[in-house]
């Protein structure tokens, strides 16, 4: 449905038949998450849709990030990928000398390991990925504008992964100012992705101080309303050497929520991958 407003403030609506919407959905490109259970929960990753995966266990969110970046490049028919280019918008403290904080930078070694596990030459993946780091909230806003321009100018891009989108909001002492910047960032990238049919995947933090069985995502109401699909992920079992995680679908366009599944990971080449 398109909305147009004339100078006389009259509003007209362009109506679409159910068949048109069905054909549009049927022809929509869809990428696997790399997990049959997660695919079943959210119906894969579709172009033009905004996904938010959030929680406080960074291991699983990082595993999702690397898996999605690789899957974007995979062939569409044989491997259920987008067979296209992807962008990683990484929010990280690059100017710290703390090794633990440096480890949150995107690792070429981990991309290589994940690519080999997916059965694709790492060189092909490297050629089809853009990585844009942001080191503070002001830089985050600048990078958002650059990424939006890149998506608009390069029609081969079908996936944007924003790693730790709420990082600077979580760590900020001036929540009001940072919340406003975060809102601008979300608005810029979500509009660019929707307009150009690019899948938008964000990872974020959970608000552990909030009441309720399932914590809300950090970032305010705007983030919650902007995302089309929202999944909360928490550690489920510590009984084995490799933990499992519970993914709970909080919001979806056409699936009843809440709905949950268990995700498994595997350790390989010094990293954890979604299984």
Give, region by region, the residue ranges found by the protein language model.
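Conserved inter-motif catalytic segment of the P-loop NTP-binding fold
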Residues: 83-172
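Structural motif
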Residues: 52, 159-163, 201
